[in-house]
Amino acid sequence: MKILVTGADGYIGRHVIAELLDRGCEVIASDLRKEGIDPRARVAEADIFSEDQELYEKLGSPDVLIHLAWRNGFDHYNKSHVDDLPKHYRFLAAMMD
């Protein structure tokens, strides 16, 4: 089973990926930053907010998605949180099609 984790280099993402890998899962990691991603994971580079029709394939055709990506994560009052909601929805819908 292939599991895609977005926000892979974030605090939660790094811990989720490590646990999945320790349990023997095949992990595909996606993030704008790559420095802290566990080297055992396969890194997929793609803009999750793009309207690319082949985004699912570019992200490794995962069986499971754990979507943890969130721009400006700890800046709780950042306008980007509201502005990005439609993009998150579009990404999730694209991954289900």
Q: Whereabouts are the PLM-identified features?
A:
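N-terminal Rossmann NAD(P)H-binding glycine-rich loop of SDR-like oxidoreductase domains
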Residues: I3-R23
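Conserved glycine-rich Rossmann-like NAD(P)H-binding loop of the short-chain dehydrogenase/reductase
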Residues: C25-G36
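Conserved Rossmann-fold NAD(P)-dependent oxidoreductase catalytic core, especially the SDR/UDP-sugar
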Residues: R90-D97
